[in-house]
């Protein structure tokens, strides 16, 4: 398991510099080792806390929280009204009203998209073929072993 604090610390290292935060953004991180990382990631809107103002830094991060953070880092924001009916749907992600529904769909479906009129949210235009990443890695290793290229 990886904690919410550990994941925030990893993500905050993608930033070029930290934020100067005078007051913690969550009520339960004042003496935590990852306090600055958590504040930095929250300032960029990459992570969120809970409605009661806490972050729960030592709680194990969920799949939904992790993919939401990764999507935020990559600035990938799907619009539920513009997903494609033919996308892969997961048995444990069928509740379209769940806060994480779009984030899971974004992270698990390869697709092309458009951003219209400066919109922040993606309109999916087509699904891409799922790649066999294990086979691609094997081909890459073999090609580089002999000085060739893959793709």
Identify what each model region corresponds to:
Residues 44:
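Post-HExxH zinc-binding segment in Zn-dependent metallohydrolases
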Residues 1-5, 13-36, 47-64, 74-151:
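Feature responds to low-complexity, polar/acidic, surface-exposed segments characteristic
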């Amino acid at each position: 398991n990886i904690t919410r604090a550990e994941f925030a610390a990893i993500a905050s290292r993608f930033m070029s510099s930290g934020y100067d935060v005078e007051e913690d953004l969550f009520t339960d991180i004042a003496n935590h080792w990852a306090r600055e990382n958590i504040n930095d990631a929250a300032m960029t809107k990459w992570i969120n806390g809970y409605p009661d103002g806490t972050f729960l830094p030592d709680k194990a991060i969920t799949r939904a929280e992790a993919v939401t953070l990764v999507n935020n880092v990559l600035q990938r924001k799907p619009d539920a009204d513009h997903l494609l009916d033919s996308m892969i749907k997961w048995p444990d992600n069928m509740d379209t009203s769940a806060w994480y529904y779009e984030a899971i769909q974004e992270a698990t479906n390869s697709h092309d998209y458009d951003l219209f009129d400066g919109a922040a949210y993606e309109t999916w235009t087509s699904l891409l073929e799922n790649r066999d990443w294990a086979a691609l890695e094997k081909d890459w290793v073999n090609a580089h072993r002999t000085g060739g290229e893959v793709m």
